[in-house]
Design a protein with these regions (language model features):
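Conserved phosphate- and dinucleotide-binding cores of soluble alpha/beta proteins
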Residues: 1-219
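Nucleic-acid processing machinery
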Residues: 225-227, 252-255, 268
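Secondary-structure boundary/capping micro-motif
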Residues: 237-239
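A short beta-loop-alpha structural element at the N-terminal edge
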Residues: 242-258
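Edge strands and adjacent loops of beta-rich recognition modules
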Residues: 227-229, 247, 276
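Conserved GNAT-fold acetyl-CoA-binding loop/helix
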Residues: 264-276
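Long, charged amphipathic helices and adjacent flexible linkers at domain junctions
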Residues: 217-235
């Protein structure tokens, strides 16, 4: 559902390309608008390529004898090496839960199987290998009723890891983006707590403290900041440069240290009138 929802917000983009397992109504709509033209693809240029299609009748009518659409077996479309031939490949996959090390469960709820694994691992790996690629796991921060966090301290008993923590680079919820690539377990846990629902953050942090993944002094970030209008992130443009303004989060501790370490003694005294 999340990948399909993303398509609805791409109407103002241009020159997009598709290399996917599935063609759906959302892709057809963007192709008809000219948003998807595959002009800049570096593999299968000018073609939307997939393994199968599913959707309303308009999908089947659109792909029938369409010279701009090609279907290939899954061993071709899902090959990470072939996926990676597309520069700036963005792979967006959903998940049922993600633990604080970055392990992704996407096919089961505990012992109950919910779906198959599909091509998630293939496309996450392919996007990771792509020049400028972005492998993304996206999910709501809670279950539909809001009672259970989907960012969890440990995987639900019986749940299976589909995508390992070694392959996950970005996890996205409605509360932001957790960047995991190259991060330690401590940094990963703090990044993921940052994008969990605010009402679950303290509990998640307490659990990782218990396992000594983070120091005892570590605190969670505030759930809202009045200075920003109770939002957690704001984007703006100044002098033709894009900026992102957000509160400092626990995951930023090392960046803050490096910021201070970059100052010489004169700067420290002039800025803070104190040795740091």
């Amino acid at each position: 559902k999340i990948p399909e929802a993303v398509l609805r917000y791409l109407g103002n983009h241009k020159d997009l390309g598709i290399h996917s397992e599935m063609i759906s109504d959302g892709i057809v709509d963007l192709m008809k608008k000219g948003v998807i033209n595959n002009r800049r693809k570096t593999y299968h240029k000018g073609k939307t390529v997939a393994t199968f299609c599913i959707g309303s009748q308009k999908v089947y009518d659109f792909v029938d004898a369409n010279p701009h659409v090609e279907f290939y077996p899954s061993e071709h479309i899902n090959s990470p090496v072939k996926i990676a031939k597309n520069d700036k490949m963005v792979s967006i996959n959903s998940a049922i839960e993600v633990d604080l090390t970055g392990q992704v469960v996407s096919d089961s709820i505990g012992y109950q199987f919910y779906s198959g694994i599909g091509g998630q691992v293939d496309f996450i790996r392919g996007a990771s290998l792509s020049k400028g690629g972005k492998p993304i796991i996206a999910l709501p921060s809670t279950t539909r009723d809001g009672k259970v966090s989907r960012i969890v301290s440990h995987i639900t008993e019986g749940g299976g890891v589909v995508t390992s923590r070694g392959h996950v680079s970005y996890v996205v919820t409605e509360f932001g983006i957790a960047s995991l690539q190259g991060k330690s377990i401590r940094e990963r846990a703090l990044e993921l707590i940052k994008v969990a629902h605010p009402k679950f953050r303290d509990k998640l942090l307490a659990n990782v403290r218990k396992h000594y993944w983070v120091p005892e002094y570590q605190e969670s970030s505030p759930s809202s900041v009045p200075e920003l209008g109770t939002i957690e992130m704001k984007r703006f443009n100044f002098a033709n440069i894009n900026y992102m303004l957000r509160p400092l989060a626990p995951a930023d501790e090392r960046k803050l240290q490096e910021f201070f370490y970059s100052h010489n003694k004169e700067t420290l005294m002039m800025r803070y009138n104190h040795h740091i």
